[in-house]
A protein has these predicted regions:
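PLP-dependent aspartate aminotransferase-fold enzymes
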Residues: 1-8, 12-15, 202-303, 307, ...
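Conserved PLP phosphate-binding loop immediately N-terminal to the Schiff-base lysine helix
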Residues: 2-9, 23-52, 304-317, 331-355
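N-terminal glycine-rich, Lys/His-bearing helix-loop that initiates the first secondary-structure elements
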Residues: 13, 17-18, 100-210, 549-550, ...
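Helix C-cap/helix->beta junction micro-motif
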Residues: 17-24, 326-330, 446
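Active-site C-terminal subdomain of aminotransferase-like
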Residues: 43-124, 354-441
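PLP-dependent enzyme catalytic core of the Aspartate aminotransferase-like
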Residues: 102-114, 420-422, 500-557
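Conserved C-terminal alpha-helix-loop-beta "cap" of PLP-dependent enzymes
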Residues: 152, 161, 448, 458-508, ...
Length: 557
């Protein structure tokens, strides 16, 4: 109501600033109830939709923007800039539609014909997607032949037009037992009383991590933000964060503190300024860490034990020992980001436990969702809790009230029970060793493969990058490799590359992958990587085999 009354004044201020050479944007945040009043406001540039559109039952967020602003997300190189741009949570989105149908039946009725056509007409769907969402992503979908095909997921496979493709990405390390676990609803329902579930989850997490306090989050990036906020609040006035270069904290504003790649931070300054970066792979890394503590009041150390986005590279043991020593010597906090390595991805619940490292702060995500709803968690020590209490800081309680939702909590508890019952750590370790052994044997002598690195079921295959023209040729070949694996005649495989290191093929299969599937996936990878360039071109660019008529399949909205 206040914004509606002041709409004309806001627009006048913006026009005045624009006349002075600035280009401010008006961003309006709306809930479901006030949606109808947005249009006559001061013609906002961006409209943000909050979780009231899902009755605050599951995480949801979206925005609409002027075409001139949204164009930035569609230009070359931005197609998969942010994971939620190309893989929004389907269940949360469908729930939003159901809630909107109840709350605004007039709106849904007004657009019913368009929605029905989107559901049944692939060509129309593609045009709307390109115009309203992302032209570059629409082009990518056409390139891989998915633009006129119904896509389904079940277990370890994505089915496209009747053709099953093994999902070796799984939301980039989210997949515990594949897509759409058939018993999920019954398992969640059997967990019983919510308070009893919370107490059991807390007890299990304490046993697994040694950390007594948990703060829920709705993404890995928000879990990283929680950790940094809690850590720095307890360490005040020490405001410096020591970050290992090559890390990836996420793409929200504070999580970018731990995201090393400058191109991901460019253009959205100012970010948190009190950050010191050290290259953990440099020959003088230990000296650089010690020097950073001599020059700066370090409050929090942030690191990943395996840099998943940065090439599936483990933090050197001597650097890790140095960080632990500096933590103890200078009474700072060790924050280990295990959003990608945690929840059994490398075998145990956390790689920290496997390496004998006791963090003060620990972020987990990905697998915590069971590939269903977005969920993540920040764990912190009793010492941090006591420091916050002594400062009368209620930040942890505020974050819990904002980010907690029952279904996410139940989902993680169900994952922990599932892992214990099926001895998941041992299974993941065995499958990881199998991948390392079989890929090592199959790729031995392959000229364009430098190394295979396996940490449980977080696997990187480093290819020759080359330089100059050879580097350009390698990049072209690498894209053809992905397409050739996707179109493999016996075991089609969906896989990707590391974002920082595009010459490192990255595989994050479901933790429930079978021995036979490991063998078949390795055979696909080996057969494609051994192709000469001319055959790789044909294998990557040949049309996808078609199964039946794909023009008029329907989906339900």
């Amino acid at each position: 109501n206040v914004l509606e009354a002041q709409g004309d004044e806001l627009r006048r201020l913006i026009d005045g600033a624009s006349a002075g050479g600035a280009t401010p944007r008006l961003i309006v945040c709306t809930d479901c109830e006030s949606l109808a009043s947005v249009s006559p406001l001061a013609a906002p540039d961006i409209i943000v939709f909050d979780e009231s559109f899902t009755d605050s039952q599951v995480p949801f967020g979206a925005f609409a923007a002027r075409r001139s602003l949204l164009r930035h997300w569609s230009k070359r190189g931005m197609t998969i800039f942010h994971s939620t741009t190309y893989q929004p949570n389907t269940i949360s989105t469908l729930h939003m539609l159901h809630c909107l149908r109840r709350a605004r039946p007039d709106f849904m009725e007004r657009h019913a014909a368009t929605l029905a056509r989107i559901a049944r007409d692939f060509d129309f769907r593609g045009r709307v997607f390109a115009e309203r969402y992302s032209r570059s992503l629409a082009r990518l979908i056409r390139t891989v032949g998915w633009h006129e095909t119904e896509v389904k997921t079940s277990g370890h496979y994505v089915e496209i037009g009747g053709r099953r493709i093994f999902d070796g990405v799984g939301g980039v390390a989210c997949s515990i037992r594949g897509h759409n676990p058939p018993d999920y609803l019954a398992e969640i329902d059997r967990l019983g009383d919510p308070q009893a579930c919370r107490e059991e989850l807390a007890a299990r997490l304490l046993e697994l991590t040694g950390l007594a306090h948990a703060t829920p989050a709705v993404s890995g990036a928000s879990a990283v933000e929680h950790a940094l906020k809690l850590g720095l609040a307890s360490q005040y006035p020490r405001e410096r964060v020591l970050v290992m270069r090559g890390g990836f904290g996420g793409k929200t504003l504070f999580a970018l503190t731990g995201t090393w790649k400058t191109s991901l931070r460019r253009g959205i300054d100012p970010l948190y300024p009190h950050v010191v970066y050290v290259d953990p792979f440099a020959a003088d890394a230990v000296t650089a860490v010690e020097s950073a503590f001599e020059r700066h009041p370090i409050g929090v150390i942030q690191c990943e034990l395996v840099q998943g986005v940065g090439g599936v590279r483990p933090l050197p043991a001597d650097v890790l020992r140095c960080l632990a020593k500096m933590r103890d010597r200078h009474d700072c906090l060790l924050f280990v980001d295990e959003v990608q390595t945690g929840v059994y991805r490398t075998g145990p619940f956390s790689r920290s436990a496997e390496l004998g490292v006791q963090p003060d702060l620990l972020a987990v995500g990905k697998g915590a969702s069971d590939m269903m709803f977005p969920y993540a968690l920040t764990l912190h020590s009793q010492a941090i809790e006591e420091r916050l209490a002594a400062r009368h800081c209620d930040l942890a309680a505020v974050l819990r009230s904002r980010y907690d939702y029952e279904l996410g909590m139940r989902t993680l508890l169900n994952v922990l029970r599932h892992a214990a019952e099926r001895q998941l750590p041992e299974t993941v370790r065995e499958r990881g060793e199998q991948f390392q052994r079989v890929l090592g044997e199959m790729l031995r002598g392959c000229g364009n493969v430098r190394e295979v690195r396996s940490f449980g079921l977080l696997i990187g295959i480093e290819l020759e990058a080359g330089a100059g023209f050879r580097r350009w040729l390698s990049r072209v070949r690498q894209q053809l490799v992905l397409l050739a694996m996707l179109k493999h005649p016996r075991m089609p495989l969906l896989v990707g590359y590391c974002q920082y290191e595009p010459h490192v093929l990255k595989l994050t299969p479901p933790l429930s992958i079978t021995e036979e599937e490991v063998e078949n996936v390795c055979e696909t990878i080996s057969s494609v990587l051994r192709l000469p360039l001319s055959k790789a071109v044909w294998a990557g660019l040949r049309p996808l085999p078609k199964t039946g008529s794909l023009k008029s399949r329907e989906i339900t909205i």
